């Protein structure tokens, strides 16, 4: 059992993601469970920003091995302009 736990900790998946809200705006976040996080946004239990802009649609994500990498990338993406974010989305 402890072997499995340590193995999981060696290769965790963390995601930086962008969702498009129903009003056309973009929201960037990070999570360790991408499918669940998008569902959470869509039932109104996610970020305050997305609660009144449902439904949201996943348009972009990147995978990282650590929370620190994912949150660093989240910050970097949040610094981009809307146009730059769309370029990133379309390039993938």
Protein language model features and the residues they cover:
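GIY-YIG nuclease catalytic motif and its immediate N-terminal context
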Residues: 1-46, 51-55, 61-63, 68-78, ...
């Amino acid at each position: 059992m402890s072997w499995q736990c340590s193995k999981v900790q060696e290769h965790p998946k963390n995601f930086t993601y962008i969702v498009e809200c129903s009003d056309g705006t973009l929201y960037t976040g990070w999570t360790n469970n991408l499918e669940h996080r998008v569902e959470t946004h869509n039932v109104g239990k996610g970020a305050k920003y997305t609660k009144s802009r449902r439904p949201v649609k996943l348009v972009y994500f990147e995978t990282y091995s650590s929370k620190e990498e994912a949150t660093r990338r989240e910050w970097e993406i949040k610094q981009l302009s809307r146009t730059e974010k769309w370029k990133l989305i379309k390039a993938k």
